Amino acid sequence: RGLGDVYKRQTKNFHDMELKELALERAKTWLSDQYDEQTRQQVQQMIDQDSDELVDAFYKDLEFGTGGMRGIMGVGTNRMNRYTIGAATQGLADYLKEQFPGKPISVVIGCDVRHNSDTFSRMCAEVLSANGIKAYLFDGFRPTPEISFAIRYLHAQSGIIITASHNPPKYNGYKAYWDDGSQVVPPHDTGIIDRVAKVHVGDIRFTPDEQLIETIGPEVDRAFVEAAVEHGSC
């Protein structure tokens, strides 16, 4: 092996050290009182163990892109959890209030059967309601087409689907929909992305207004089936 191989190894080691230091500094911010006790304990344990998991969980932010976001569930800035989902929903709420100033806003929320999908859905409803936005929350798991239908049926301005499609079980995801029942497209996609990027943990409104959270289910189920039959989809 020549000097080139030695240089490559040294460069990689240096890069790995930089990532580790970056991840450690970012992880330490999650030990503040802005995060719940269980999260702080999990982060401290990761720091104490000095594991590769710490680097992967904190070296970057979980990206919210045109297709929403998708990632491994767990604590960290690069994971699906209460705070990354909270930030995404707060950003969506901020954007909706910009787009529909002074008007009543509602959002339909549904999920698939993945681990934590129902918990994450509830989190979305709580953040939206805390922002004065009505949340229509399905009473259980539903297929994506029905959630898309419900957005139009209930005349909502947006929708959220908690799903990671074909990814392995440790993943989950977050997809934003617009009032036409389809995933957000320009200019709304970039508008939401920009708003989400500006959200800090202290900006997230977690305290729900239960009066703005409405459970939906059988009525929408029936309307969905009837519409599918009427239009020849069944």
What are these regions (language model features)?
Residues L19, W30-L31, G102-D179:
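Ferredoxin-reductase
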Residues W30, Q34, E53-F58, L62, ...:
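Gly/Ser/Thr-enriched, mixed-charge loops and adjacent short helices
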